[in-house]
Amino acid sequence: MGWSQDLFRALWRSLSREVKEHVGTDQFGNKYYYIPQYKNWRGQTIREKRIVEAANKKEVDYEAGDIPTEWEAWIRRTRKTPPTMEEILKNEKHREEIKIKSQDFYEKEKLLSKETSEELLPPPVQTQIKGHASAPYFGKEEPSVAPSSTGKTFQPGSWMPRDGKSHNQ
């Protein structure tokens, strides 16, 4: 089936006046082609095309990063001229340098944050736990002057006698 499809494509290209120019190859072996604008046999104007023939023919084997960023920009028409191999290698080297610098920065930041967090945090304080969180009340209840109400239970405030001195005045 594969060779018959290729034969049909070759026959169709010869009839449709579609000319495929080889523009370049990347370090992974992918080949890039440019097909200029042309008129087909019905007189329709077919706009230019930019095509990549992947080194691994199966779409299943494709992984992100198999096509360099510069070539991808050329295929998507965000870049007018195809990239050179020197440019791709220079940009790859630049990306590696940035990756190394960011890793160094991350390590320094980690050390600084560890030092400052040790300086800023107070030592842990021993807390005394009274009762249990699920208990409705725990510990010694002190009588309060103010009445308290929680749902259906009402607790009137307790009576506290005044000092004798303030009562006589």
Swiss-Prot record:
Mind listing the UniProt keywords for this protein, alphabetically? Answer: Chaperone, Cilium biogenesis/degradation, Disease variant, Mitochondrion, Phosphoprotein, Primary mitochondrial disease, Transit peptide
Q: Does the keyword Transport apply?
A: no
User: What is the annotated localization of this protein?
Assistant: Mitochondrion
The Phosphoserine modification is found at 134
Q: Name one GO biological process term.
A: cilium assembly
Superkingdom: Eukaryota
Could you tell me one molecular function GO term of this UniProt entry? Answer: protein-containing complex binding
Q: What's any one GO cellular component for it?
A: mitochondrial inner membrane
Q: How does it assemble?
A: Interacts with ARMC9.
Entry's family note: Belongs to the complex I NDUFA12 subunit family.
The UniProt function text for this chain reads: Acts as a molecular chaperone for mitochondrial complex I assembly. Complex I functions in the transfer of electrons from NADH to the respiratory chain. The immediate electron acceptor for the enzyme is believed to be ubiquinone. Is involved in the initial steps of cilia formation, including removal of CP110 from the mother centrioles, docking of membrane vesicles to the mother centrioles, and establishment of the transition zone.
Its recorded name reads NADH dehydrogenase [ubiquinone] 1 alpha subcomplex assembly factor 2
Look up and give the organism this protein is from. Homo sapiens
